[in-house]
Each structure stands twice: as C-alpha cells, then as structure tokens.
Amino acid sequence: MNFDCIPREDLHGILCHMPKAELHIHIEGSLEPELIFELATRNRIQLPYPTIDELRAAYAFTDLQSFLDIYYAGASVLQKEADFFDMAWAYLKRAKAENVVHAEIFFDPQTHTARGIPFETVINGLDRAIRRGREELGLSASLILCFLRHLSEEDAFAALEDALPFRDKFIGVGLDSSERGNPPEKFTRVFARCRELGLRLVAHAGEEGSAEYISHSLDLLKAERIDHGVHCLDDPKLVARLVQQRIPLTVCPLSNVKLCVFPSLSAHNIGKLLAAGIAATINSDDPAYFGGYLNRNYTATFAALPGLGAKEAYQLARNSFEASFVNENIKEGWIRELDEFFTHYRENEGKWLPL
C-alpha cells in the first residue's frame, strides 16, 4: 500500500478515525474524577479531596509507585456491581467514539477482594457492560484478569480460584503493578496453571524493569504478548527474538512519559521499535490518570515524532488487530476494514474523508 500521497497535516484526522484495537487498558485506570465523586456519593464514602479539581491536581506522579498509591485509593469507591458496570460502560462509550472496534480490558480483582468486595460483584458488573457494548455499540471487548505482582504467589492462586467459576467471562491473565522487586519468576507456577486451563497469557515487563524481565516473562511465564516492553531495545538478541517470533508489545506512550520512563514524547522509542520490525501497538494504559485515551496517545505521539507518518499509523493499527486474542477470520475482517479506510482516502485524491 502506497502512503506517500498522504500529507502530514492529514494525520490527525486519520489517526482519530481509522479503526483500531486497544490491548492495554486497565479498567480501574479509566475511572474519571467525576465518576469517582459520583460513586463516592452513591456509596457514602468520604474522599480525602473536597472537590473534583483537587482530586485532579493530586494526579502529580513521580514514578509508578506514587501513581499506584492514588490508583488504589480511587478504586475504593467501587463497591457494588452497578459501580463496576458504570465504570466499564463509560470506557466502552469513549472507545466507540474513538473508533476502537475491539478492546481487551485488564481488571485487578485483588484490589477489590482485599476490600471485601466479592469477585462475582466485580466480574458480573464488567461483563454486563461488555455484553451491552456488543449489543448497543457493536464494540467487541473481552476481559483479562491481572495478578498484582507486589502480592504473593499464594494470593495470585487464591484470585485464580475465585475466578474459575466465572471462566467464561474472561479470556486470559496478566501480571501488573510494580516490577521493582517482583520479577516474573515469582509467578511461574501460577502462569503454568493458567496455561493448563487454556487461558491466554500476557505480562507487564520492561517498563521500569529491565530487558531481562521481558525475556523471563517469555521463557518462564510463556507470555504471548508483552505489556510495555520498551526496554527491549537494550538487548539486541531479545529484539531479534521479538521480531522473528512476532511477539507483540502493547506500548503506552503518555503513560511512559507521565511515569518518567521517558523524559518526553519526543524521546520515546516507539518509532525505533517499529523500524526494528517489532509488532508494537499504541494503547492508553490508565487514561483517566495519564492525560489521554487511545486517540490522544496516537495524536500526541505522532505530533512529537516527525518520523512517524501514515505508513506507521497503518502498521500500528494493523498490529493491534493481529496481536488481539480473537480468531483469524475476525482479525482478517478488521484488517480489511483498515485497508478500505486507507483506500478510501486515496480514492478521494488525497482528501481525508470519513467512510
């Protein structure tokens, strides 16, 4: 496909309107301050911030741990099934408006069960929103259960046991929270059990952790997809492996800058990842906290990196479909939609028009 006819000034519209998938979104991280206050009022929870603006002002993170502290505090307003539904439904509506056609959504059950919230309350609310999204929005979505790596292996096994009666409502498991002091090998046995159960496997690695964490996630956890993974470029052998085996990375540019993984978007390595042949994707991570949903991650990144153009936009969107955990026929259908989107652009003589 020839992308030379697409001028840079048209990129913003193309990035916002092209069909795409989101593969790295923590649903608790989509909890906007307005909804936090609404749920706090509904559930009679006293927040430490008297106004929405003061809560927003508290989103001044210096590293991953300082973010996680307020992230878990915000999740405390989630008490009932309706709360989890409302949170997920708000995200799905936003995703639909941004031309996301498929989302694979992380959720952290241990954050909630530790507060005495039953697992079924969490997953039933999320699942109800996903089913409504399919019916009313035509948006495909699925759930991935994430284990909190700062907790013990025993806690992870307990979370898995809680989840098994609801096995039909999630497609896989992941590993999130702080990498420091919590290497992948801590959860080797948990992931082995999940693999036996036929669950899809992903893991956060190489965000604040080293390239070795990525290798260990692949070798020990048998992860099929790496979340973040930006430190892979520190290891040329790992890069070659990622390219050869087509192991996708779910990269989150605005998150990386907010958490000081990179000093600025102009210093981000997403362009280098693509140039190396890695199946990188762009995602929002925790959009309510990091200043942008999926389209903002695309547009801000492309604005900051002049080397990225229409070819990279197409490749990132295509990678997002190819890296998703759906059957090949569905993937091929989405890729045809993407091809038609760019073909439609060319047929209109270089003028961007929506399909």
UniProtKB/Swiss-Prot annotation:
User: Which Gene Ontology cellular component terms are annotated?
Assistant: cytosol
Name its GO BP terms in alphabetical order.
Answer: adenine catabolic process; hypoxanthine salvage; nucleotide metabolic process
Q: Which reaction does it catalyse?
A: adenine + H2O + H(+) = hypoxanthine + NH4(+)
Coiled-coil residue spans = none
Instruction: State its cofactor.
Output: Zn(2+)
InterPro entries per the UniProt record, alphabetical: A_deaminase_dom, ADE, Ado/ade_deaminase, Metal_Hydrolase
Q: Where is this site: Important for catalytic activity?
A: 228
Query: What highest taxon heads this organism's lineage?
Result: Bacteria
Q: Name one Pfam family in it.
A: A_deaminase
Query: Where, in this chain's numbering, is substrate bound?
Result: 286
The positions annotated for binding Zn(2+) are 24, 26, 204, 285
Q: Where is the active site?
A: 207
Enzyme Commission number(s) from the entry:
3.5.4.2
Q: GO molecular function terms here?
A: adenine deaminase activity; zinc ion binding
Primary enzyme class: hydrolase
Cofactor info, note text: Binds 1 zinc ion per subunit.
What keywords sit in the KW lines? Hydrolase, Metal-binding, Nucleotide metabolism, Zinc
Q: What function does the entry list?
A: Catalyzes the hydrolytic deamination of adenine to hypoxanthine. Plays an important role in the purine salvage pathway and in nitrogen catabolism.
**Family to which this protein belongs:** Belongs to the metallo-dependent hydrolases superfamily. Adenosine and AMP deaminases family. Adenine deaminase type 2 subfamily.
Q: Which NCBIfam families match?
A: aden_deam, PRK09358.1-6
**Record's protein name:** Adenine deaminase
Give the organism the record lists: Geotalea uraniireducens (strain Rf4)
Lineage of this protein's species? Bacteria, Pseudomonadati, Thermodesulfobacteriota, Desulfuromonadia, Geobacterales
